[in-house]
Amino acid sequence: MTVLSEKKCIPCEGGVPPLEKKEIDKLLAELQNEWQVNELGHLYKKYKFPNFVKALDFANKIAAIAEQEVHHPNLNISWGVCNVEIWTHKINGLTENDFILAAKIESKI
């Protein structure tokens, strides 16, 4: 079995169904703690930092990973916090790409 962080995101062209709950739960178990699926059905994690600059630095590191993977999360930065929200926009749901990106964020930061 390939570790999620070692996989590559595959561009989604739409027309594919979002993952089912059983698949989501399986992939969620492969991620580190605190990742969850929010009320919108998006993958979500809140990261805390000692100040705004550290949160911004973290967001910039995520941006570099997202550009490499051509899969982009929503980031919300405030003082000492960076909220990361990931989903596949073209299908408005979760795909394996979302979990790959989350795993890469965890493994490289």
UniProtKB/Swiss-Prot annotation:
InterPro entries: PCD_sf (IPR036428), Pterin_deHydtase (IPR001533). One of its GO terms (molecular function) is 4-alpha-hydroxytetrahydrobiopterin dehydratase activity. It comes from the Bacteria. Its EC number is 4.2.1.96. It catalyses: (4aS,6R)-4a-hydroxy-L-erythro-5,6,7,8-tetrahydrobiopterin = (6R)-L-erythro-6,7-dihydrobiopterin + H2O. Keywords: Lyase. GO terms for biological process: tetrahydrobiopterin biosynthetic process. It holds the Pfam family Pterin_4a. The keyword Lyase applies. Belongs to the pterin-4-alpha-carbinolamine dehydratase family. This is Putative pterin-4-alpha-carbinolamine dehydratase.
